Amino acid sequence: LAFATGAVRTLATVDVALAEGAGTSARFTVDLSTLDAATHLLLISCHAAAAPHVPLSLNEELLAPPGDLHLPTATVGAAVADQANRDGTVNVTVRSSSTALYVTLTTRAHGHFSDNAFAMPPGERQLTFVPLGTPDLRGLAASLRVEHLQPYLSHPPAAHADSSAPAASAA
């Protein structure tokens, strides 16, 4: 995932055959030399051969410590649906103006989100809030908070993630 654009490209596809059961693994290597660790996130997805477009798992791996990342400024927000779904869950739409990492949603409403602390390219993503008990739409919407990594970094946000020019400073 390129921070500047949100573009995703495939670096490698590896076919593996694993035995059934827990504790099975396969090792392989992927050439990461074409990536700048400060401007990219490695997305690792696992798919079954019978359903290649349905991920079984998705892992997001930083290639550099968070403090070394050059993330763009991102405005991230979320909106709660006006009504609960038939099963009692509530749709939450998350929007980001730029790539954002560790997008985290919190609320005082009792329950959990279908995903949290995730990487998000620019655009929109639908999550589900799973309440404990009766959904409290008003409480969920009123207390919903969305945070992400970039505002907590100590250096200025990257204007262009591929820029090698030093940042100007005022004296």
Predicted features and spans:
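Extracellular and select intracellular beta-sandwich modules with Ser/Thr-enriched
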Residues: 10-12, 55-63
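Low-complexity, acidic Ser/Thr/Pro/Gly-rich terminal tails and inter-domain linkers that flank the onset
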Residues: 62-86
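Structural beta-strand segments of beta-rich domains
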Residues: 88-92
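Asparagine-centered strand-capping/turn motif at beta-strand->loop junctions
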Residues: 93-98
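Short, hydrophobic/aromatic beta-strand segments
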Residues: 100-107
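Mature N-terminal, pre-catalytic/accessory segment of carbohydrate-active enzymes
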Residues: 160-166
